[in-house]
Amino acid sequence: MKRILSFIFIILFFNSSYAVEKAAIITDYKPIFLPVITENKKIKIAIRSYLKNKKSYFVLVDPNSFKTEIVLQELVILPANKIEKENLLIKLNKTSYIKALNKYNFIDQSLQSFKQDEFSNKFTDNTIVYEHKLNSKSSHSSTFMNSTVQQNYGATSSMYKVKGQFLTIDMCPSSKNFEEVFFKKLVELSTKLKKAIPITICVSGLWINKHTEEFLWLLKQQENGYLQITWVNHSFSHPYFKDKPLEDNFLLSNKDDFENEVLEVGKILVSYNIAPSPFFRFPGLVSDQTLIAKLKNFGFIPLGSNAWLAKGEKIQDGSFILVHGNSNEKAGIDLIMPMLSELKLLPIEKAFLPTNL
């Protein structure tokens, strides 16, 4: 009996100690775009710098793989001068990261516009479902007075032909527990297939702050090799107002606060020693030309979706599947659950890499 009680105590101790794990204090977190040379002589791009415990760190992007890492600044070689920096950037011009950054941060002015009364918005618990009438399937912009609202701007599917799909899971702020059955199903699938399941979690800062234990549980599945998670910035507060039109809603409601909305999420992630990915998903998939231009300055590639399941969109090879893991949109989860074992899920980074790599 004593052995059983001791065993139970050990389990409870480790579970509780993990749940109360505290994030490190991060200061001076800021965006940069600086080519550096790593210890193994590779050229990478520093997109963030910050201080932790009085030590300086970079978040680096590998421009050939989109993989990110956190390194001490003292372990990389910086360009000696402006000319050397420019020469390094020239060498990076043909890399997959720079190509994607340029491709998905440019507004095509030829996109067809449509008026406010040509679509309706349906919101339920922070979830938005759009129903609109467009003559062109490729059109994602709507013009309101002097500003242009963009819907679903960015990469909505793979840049190159692939056999497989990309599962993106939005974690908007929510008062509900996360989709536990769904995430545990992914872990079970990992055990069955004997490999980590690649998923992309588009996370808001408020969700992490309000659901720390669930966030840490996800990290644990990643550490244990069950889930291969790419962490995508989904803004800090994911603002939404039921009584406002799109041009004054989501991040368009306060464009002056855009930098803070973006940087606070990254700051939270690095405090847990997570290297943020070079991707961003606009709340509600709503943006405009101003925010898209700013996004490039942060080194971010915007992610949309051509398979938002709750909207009735169908999955194809190369699709960026969109479901909500925060329990605010059950329809998408109900649809994806029976499909999970049949899908060939790929890491989001592979969507931007030529298939011969």
Swiss-Prot record:
GO terms for biological process: carbohydrate metabolic process. Keywords: Signal. InterPro entries: Glyco_hydro/deAcase_b/a-brl, RPE3. It comes from the Bacteria. The keyword Signal applies. Residues 1-19 form the signal peptide. NCBIfam families: RPE3. This is Uncharacterized protein RP012.
